[in-house]
């Protein structure tokens, strides 16, 4: 009787194995694994947030989704084999896509197009199989390719082309001016070689008189002749008035 009432060692082992099986079936069917480091994306580009279950198994019939706090805003939801676009938050409608090529192995990726600064922060991925659900958190870091450029640098970048153009025009002008001066200097030297040095030492008033007299001489002679002719005709006209017959 004593031997029958005392539990045997194999009975204990069977009981422990049964507990482990039940706990593995209901307490830990799978776990969700996300990226261990923040996902980086540039403004305007696309970001991909991977998520998977372990151990891997077919997740086609599961409910898969991403949401954000606060208020558990739905970023993307997959249920009954279809994307539930109507349940998305307004800011993500038309911008997300669930990549399901490896969903048979329990691997999916959420693609967010046209990334914006408000997209930066935490996302939560979840897998739900009937009443069992597991989830994993991940971070998205959004960067601007010009984040390092201060307003002063932007102003400098805008002014530099104009300044460069002005400097270029100024250098071209100085070059042309120097070339023109050299040409004029050469022409003046040629004139010095052409003219007699003795002529160049003549006083200026003599040169002026030498140039003006040939021009004004005929003009003065013409004026004198005109006055003489005018007086002669006037005298004849007066004489005819005195002796009409």
Swiss-Prot record:
Transmembrane segments: 153-173, 209-229
CDD domains reported in the protein's UniProt record: IgV_MOG_like
Disulphide-bridged cysteine pairs: 51-125
InterPro entries in the cross-refs: Ig-like_dom (IPR007110), Ig-like_dom_sf (IPR036179), Ig-like_fold (IPR013783), Ig_sub (IPR003599), Ig_V-set (IPR013106), IgSF_BTN/MOG (IPR050504), Myelin-oligodendrocyte_glycop (IPR016663)
Signal peptide: 1-27
Subunit relationships: Homodimer.
Annotated function: Minor component of the myelin sheath. May be involved in completion and/or maintenance of the myelin sheath and in cell-cell communication. Mediates homophilic cell-cell adhesion.
Protein's UniProt name: Myelin-oligodendrocyte glycoprotein
Protein species of origin: Callithrix jacchus
Record lineage: Eukaryota, Metazoa, Chordata, Craniata, Vertebrata
